[in-house]
Amino acid sequence: MAISFGGLVYPWNSGQIIALFVVACVLVVVFLAQQIWSIGTTPERRAFPLQFFKNRSLSEVSVLECCASTLTYVPVYFLPLYFQFVRHDSAIMAGVRLLPLVVFLVVAIVVNGLFVTANGRYMPWFFAGEALSHAGSALLYTVDMETSNAKVYGYSILIGTGAGFFLRLPFSVVQSLVPPESIPKAIGFVTFGQLGAPSVILAVVNAAFLNEATNSIAKSFSSILRGTIITILSGVGSDAFARLEQSTQRQILRFIVAGLNKGYIVTMASGALALILSLFLNRGRMFA
């Protein structure tokens, strides 16, 4: 709530936002304390398997899953917005334009599964996937209103293929890193990263987009009320946007695209972090 409301509903330095951040931090500390000292439960029945943090390889693989999820969900969230704002697509058509990313993501997952099952080597797949994803993220960051659809498709294919190479791989790898009786908890550990990371990251990148676009528009067009700007950002088909001059509309769209591009800074960072971490992975085979 603090991230979503900050800068839009309430100023970042307002009491409401500060209070929300304080409450969130307190709840995290309370949860960690309860898990560390097993308050009201036993170490074996804790909701979060903290003992896995002592296993370096398992921790690395979990972080890599966080990165893979970020690399997948951010473009899936932002690309349809780009096509709806810039190309004036309907929601359905904007979703259709995601097919290049989704198809190559699925194909990459299948190919990765076949080859890793055959030879057991997983480190090269992490490295190659992260390199492709990082390149795709960097290229998507350069997209503007004049970028052709073909280029956007190509960039999304790069990030989809790269993410597909290692999106599901951690679930197989962790099973070779723990005893058989700990496999369910290890899979849960990775699943937490898979679901938790994009939940937080999407809130962050959406806040960055809305704040960047809102502030840029407000600074350049002081005559447009802040409430009207928020209405415009809710969809280019709004009456408020349609009433503006065409030159003003194009300038606002440029600010919106610049705001959307901020999200790819996070994916580039995720790709870079994952690329570095992959260099420290075991180069052997699973279950060797």
Report residues per predicted region.
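Helix-loop junctions on the cytosolic side of multi-pass membrane transporters
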Residues: 33-42, 145, 211, 215, ...
